[in-house]
Amino acid sequence: MPELQLLIFTVIGLALLFDFINGFHDTANAIATSVSTRALHPSHAIIMAAFLNFLGAMYSTGVAKTIGADIVKSAQHVDEHVIIAALIGAVVWNLITWWFAVPSSSSHALVGGVIGAVLVSVGSDGLNFYGIGKIVLSLIASPLIAIVTGCLVMTVLFRIFGRFSPSAINGKFKKMQILSAAMMAFSHGSNDAQKSMGIITLALLSGGYIDVFEVPTYVKVLAATAMACGTAVGGWRIIKTIGGKIFKLEPISGFAADLNSSMVIFSATLLHLPVSTTHVVSGSIMGVGTAKRVNAVRWGVAQQMVTAWVLTIPCTAVMGAVAYQFVLWIFK
């Protein structure tokens, strides 16, 4: 088998592994609130999330184009060795944070891995700093927006339903949480699965297998399937952190968090902007908790999560740089 074909197959395999890990790593984003409030049985929640993640992943390719075309100046600055190294850095980081039950951003991990590998390969001239700035800005702004809008959504719900008894409210919102969890799962797939689509398409472009950056249908199906399979495996360690350690959720607050998260994420998808679903969901829960009372949020846990988020890009950049040297040693 020619070396280029071997490299392309390696990229596709690692990208699908990244998507699979992203699925079980980020399953918590789609179902943590509905499981923690017992609106859905865990197994039912996972089946629903897997199916809707698949449908969401097939929705569009705008985010894939942003990831594949905006981090580097052109496909000439990226070869398969760089892409493999970036994926290794992202996969290793995701596994580390999953093992320690720390909600982390797969988006940050992938961006950091690409930056580190490109810097070692061709230097800073290969990076599109305008595109990177746009991506990083969306990653930073999205959880802050989620906090504010989550607080507003919860405040509105309190105003509308505040005169009813808690038991009556929570009984109704338990059923509505099924809908909000479904919306969350679809929006998660519509944004997160596209990141690996963008990486695979970039590899196909740099290898000369396609002439323009358009995501092939088979790439969409492969990425969507990998995400759905990962979702079916589930990430129970992180579900516990997101579902209960930040703020004790009730059905009404769980509904508000899911509704808000799905709106923020899907809006980003329509704008072709990659966001961290982990950050957005966590931000929504913080905002919902703040609407109840500020000290209801466990800010110590939130601070630990923010620390992990801040460290993700620099750590994965280093991992991507080291992995690039390793990949060169293996393939050259």
Residue locations for each model-derived region?
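Multi-pass alpha-helical transmembrane bundle typical of ion/small-solute transporters
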Residues: M1-K332
